[in-house]
């Protein structure tokens, strides 16, 4: 029979204080349990078994953000697919940033109905519990004010408790145990020992001033050592009214008997003891707390332009993706597009180099760890084989020898690491690229419009140089023909008087001339 069925068979009128105190005896130095009368057995029967069943949401086995996202979408009643976005924790040692809206207005009427349904469900007489009626509370004049309009159900509360308790019930018998310390910090999270499990606190903040808080201070009895548990304290300025609990009040701990009651919050609510948020208050709790509905800020959208799982990777200020504004200059000036491609190729090489360096370091650490584990396992097996040689030990019997096969792949891993190191050296370069050099000159990487200005300035400089070159070439080409013509005119004069002179000379040599 599973533990849940075992719990189901617990009589409804069984006193909760009877759990796990059989080991206390009178006269041996350990405080004994006082004799319980019938009236005392029914005094706190308001707390049924599932209010004291240990349960907690294990952060390692459930994704609280996904649970919140689903509940958020269900609350919006969005039938179509949509994106649900919410704030993430600031650090890895913090949980979701929960806000708590305290119970107010008509919520107290629903809570009073919850107490009445609980009384009918258990069939118990709450004659010993005091201040259980909301008419006795300071908020009795605000019952007509609006609230969260969320009724509380005993059955829903019970189902949620059992759903949380099933994975944590490892044994069929509940035995309440004590610890030397009821408080500890694990991985940065506050934990409280409630007698069965460690309760892990969640961070919560009041979204407004709480209309009503309950405060329980340290008890004056010292018959039950190591039973107090400090849950947290809401500052006085954040509570409009505070009820100082007495011994037998609702939510209080009866210090006349050894504490053994857990006060679970109704479905949809939790106890806020600033800054800690608890699913229930364990026995012997101390602090100032209030009931409220936790919620987290969120929004929903139908479609998203950029999916949240695509990171905007940055390496030395270089973008790893092409921005949409970079496409415009590449259409009119292909040289800019070519420069962008070169830039992102360099960025890809930088990313690859960094990834290989990280992989090299992590695999090196794992290789060293596996090597030492290999040595320890080999030594342990050898020692175990020596002790259990008569029965064959943990080795394989081959004729008269005992053989153990332990694979050792550290050499292969070392070779792979050496090859990775060579690959890193191939793609590594200490020289600055053209883009980085230009960026260093500008004390930062230029944007797309700065690139256009650089290209235009370059084109203007080249154009000026070409114009100047063409001008000097033209001037030089015009100066050379004029120089040659002057030289030829001085050596061979071809003017008309010269022609007549030559003609008269030819006439002298002709004898037949007139």
From Swiss-Prot:
A motif (CXXC) lies at residues 82-85. Its main location: membrane. GO terms for cellular component: plasma membrane. It is a single-pass membrane protein. The record marks 316-317 as: Ancestral cleavage site. Keywords: Cell membrane, Disulfide bond, ERV, Glycoprotein, Membrane, Transmembrane, Transmembrane helix, Transposable element. Belongs to the gamma type-C retroviral envelope protein family. HERV class-I R(b) env subfamily. The CXXC motif is highly conserved across a broad range of retroviral envelope proteins. It is thought to participate in the formation of a labile disulfide bond possibly with the CX6CC motif present in the transmembrane domain. A motif (CKS-17) lies at residues 378-394. This is Endogenous retrovirus group PABLB member 1 Env polyprotein. The keyword Transmembrane applies. Residues 317-514 are annotated as: Transmembrane protein. It comes from the Eukaryota. Low expression in placenta and testis. It comes from Homo sapiens. Disulfide bonds join 395-402. SUPFAM superfamilies: Virus ectodomain. The chain crosses the membrane at residues 452-472. Glycans are attached at residues 58, 133, 140, 155, 218, 226, 267, 350, 357, 408, 412.
């Amino acid at each position: 029979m599973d533990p849940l069925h075992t719990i189901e068979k617990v009589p409804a009128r069984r006193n909760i204080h009877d759990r796990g105190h059989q080991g206390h005896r009178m006269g041996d130095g350990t405080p004994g349990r006082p004799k319980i009368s019938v009236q005392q057995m029914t005094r706190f029967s308001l707390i049924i078994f599932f209010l004291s069943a240990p349960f907690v949401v294990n952060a390692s086995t459930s994704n609280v953000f996904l649970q919140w996202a689903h509940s958020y979408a269900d609350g919006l009643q969005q039938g179509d697919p949509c994106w649900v976005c919410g704030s993430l924790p600031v650090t890895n040692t913090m949980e979701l940033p929960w806000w708590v809206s305290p119970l107010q207005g008509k919520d107290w009427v629903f809570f009073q109905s919850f107490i009445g349904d609980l009384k009918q469900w258990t069939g118990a007489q709450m004659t010993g519990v005091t201040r259980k009626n909301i008419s006795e509370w300071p908020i009795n004049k605000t019952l007509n004010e609006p609230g969260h309009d969320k009724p509380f159900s005993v059955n829903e509360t019970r189902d949620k408790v059992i759903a949380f308790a099933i994975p944590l019930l490892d044994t069929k018998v509940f035995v309440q145990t004590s610890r030397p310390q009821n408080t500890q910090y694990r991985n940065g999270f506050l934990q409280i020992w409630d007698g069965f499990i460690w309760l892990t606190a969640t961070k919560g903040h009041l979204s407004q001033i709480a209309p009503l808080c309950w405060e329980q201070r340290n008890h004056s009895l010292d018959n039950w050592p190591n039973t107090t548990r400090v849950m947290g304290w809401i500052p006085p300025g954040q509570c409009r009214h505070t009820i100082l609990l007495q011994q037998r009040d609702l939510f209080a701990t009866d210090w006349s008997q050894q504490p053994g009651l857990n006060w679970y919050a109704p479905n949809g609510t939790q106890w806020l003891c600033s800054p800690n948020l608890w699913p229930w208050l364990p026995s012997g709790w101390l602090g100032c707390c209030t009931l409220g509905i936790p919620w987290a800020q969120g929004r929903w959208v139908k479609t998203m332009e950029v999916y949240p799982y695509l990171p905007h990777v940055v390496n030395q200020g270089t973008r790893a993706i092409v921005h949409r504004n970079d496409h415009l200059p590449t259409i009119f000036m292909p040289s800019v597009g070519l420069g962008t491609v070169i830039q992102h190729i360099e960025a890809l090489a930088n990313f690859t180099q960094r990834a290989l360096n990280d992989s090299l370091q992590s695999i090196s650490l794992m290789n060293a760890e596996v090597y030492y584990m290999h040595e320890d396992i080999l030594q342990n097996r050898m020692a175990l084989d020596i002790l259990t040689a008569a029965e064959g030990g943990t080795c394989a019997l081959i004729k008269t020898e005992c053989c153990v096969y332990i694979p050792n792949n550290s050499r292969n891993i070392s070779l792979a690491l050496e090859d990775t190191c060579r690959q890193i050296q191939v793609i590594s370069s200490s020289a600055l690229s053209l883009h980085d050099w230009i960026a260093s000159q500008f004390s930062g990487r230029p944007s797309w419009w700065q690139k256009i200005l650089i290209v235009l300035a370059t084109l203007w400089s080249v154009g000026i140089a070409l114009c100047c070159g063409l001008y000097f070439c033209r001037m030089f080409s015009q100066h050379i023909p004029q120089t040659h013509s002057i030289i030829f005119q001085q050596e061979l004069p071809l003017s008309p008087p010269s022609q007549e002179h030559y003609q008269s000379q030819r006439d002298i040599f002709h004898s037949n001339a007139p």
